[in-house]
Swiss-Prot record:
InterPro entries: Chaperonin_GroES (IPR020818), Chaperonin_GroES_sf (IPR037124), Chaprnonin_Cpn10_CS (IPR018369), GroES-like_sf (IPR011032). The keyword Chloroplast does not apply. GO terms for cellular component: cytoplasm. Keywords: Chaperone, Cytoplasm. Belongs to the GroES chaperonin family. This is Co-chaperonin GroES. The keyword Chaperone applies. HAMAP family: CH10 (MF_00580). It comes from Halorhodospira halophila (strain DSM 244 / SL1). NCBIfam families: PRK00364.1-2 (NF001527), PRK00364.2-2 (NF001531), PRK00364.2-4 (NF001533), PRK00364.2-5 (NF001534). GO terms for molecular function: ATP binding; metal ion binding; protein folding chaperone; protein-folding chaperone binding; unfolded protein binding. One of its GO terms (biological process) is chaperone cofactor-dependent protein refolding. Pfam families: Cpn10 (PF00166). The gene is groES.
Length: 96
């Protein structure tokens, strides 16, 4: 199943972070914080402005992004967890 977000919404798949501390201690899932880094899976058409023009979304499918800890709404599609959030909730795009 594919998903197409509406307006300025973006679908993101969280990227797993290292589960070992710098000292070599393995951090269990129950103690680990959810990662705030993810990969853009799908983007909407853009935000419709008050004057009727559409401002396109600035992120692209495949971009790795940084977002807030509580950003987005968690959804499950075909057994996979995703976040659906507004583009405004994305703080940065990783480059290079």
């Amino acid at each position: 199943m594919s998903i197409r977000p509406l307006h300025d919404r973006v679908v993101i798949q969280r990227l797993e972070e290292e589960r070992t501390s710098p000292g070599g201690i393995v951090i269990p899932d129950t103690a680990a914080e959810k990662p705030m880094k993810g990969k853009v899976i799908a983007v909407g058409h853009g935000k419709t402005l008050d004057n009727g023009e559409r401002r396109p979304v600035e992120v692209n499918v495949g971009d790795q992004v940084l977002f807030g800890k509580y950003a987005g709404t968690e959804v499950k599609i075909d057994g996979q967890d995703y976040l659906v959030m507004r583009e405004d909730d994305i703080m940065a795009v990783f480059e290079g």
